[in-house]
Amino acid sequence: MPRIKSAIKRVKIAERNRLRNKATKAMVRALMKKVTSLSSAYAANPQPETLQEIQAAMSAAFSRIDKAAKTGVLHKNTAARRKARLSRIVQRSLAATSAS
């Protein structure tokens, strides 16, 4: 444990930031999981309400991912990759339902 006052403060700040970053990453994962589950549900049973839910969930996920990248929780390339994956998943489920 540090003895110097400024080092003690830095330990407290690092712990606070770690917990905040952990919560942000968990929220991003939860929103991504919600989008993927909604898109698979839409592929199995296409309903217009489900499509609206997908769009709302995707918007929320994109917003949270962008905020995480802006604050430095996620790297900008990681954020771009996650957004691209979500878009690809949704596009595939929409294409599968329109083809059948």
UniProtKB/Swiss-Prot annotation:
Is this entry keyworded RNA-binding? yes
Record keyword Disulfide bond present? no
GO terms of molecular function = small ribosomal subunit rRNA binding; structural constituent of ribosome
A GO BP annotation: translation
Q: Which InterPro entries match?
A: Ribosomal_bS20, Ribosomal_bS20_sf
Q: Kindly list the GO CC terms recorded for this protein.
A: cytosol; small ribosomal subunit
The record's listing under SUPFAM superfamilies reads: Ribosomal protein S20
Q: Family per UniProt?
A: Belongs to the bacterial ribosomal protein bS20 family.
Family annotation (PANTHER family): 30S RIBOSOMAL PROTEIN S20, SMALL RIBOSOMAL SUBUNIT PROTEIN BS20C
Protein name according to UniProt:
Small ribosomal subunit protein bS20
Naturally occurring in which organism (per UniProt): Synechococcus sp. (strain JA-3-3Ab) (Cyanobacteria bacterium Yellowstone A-Prime)
| Gene name of the encoded protein | rpsT
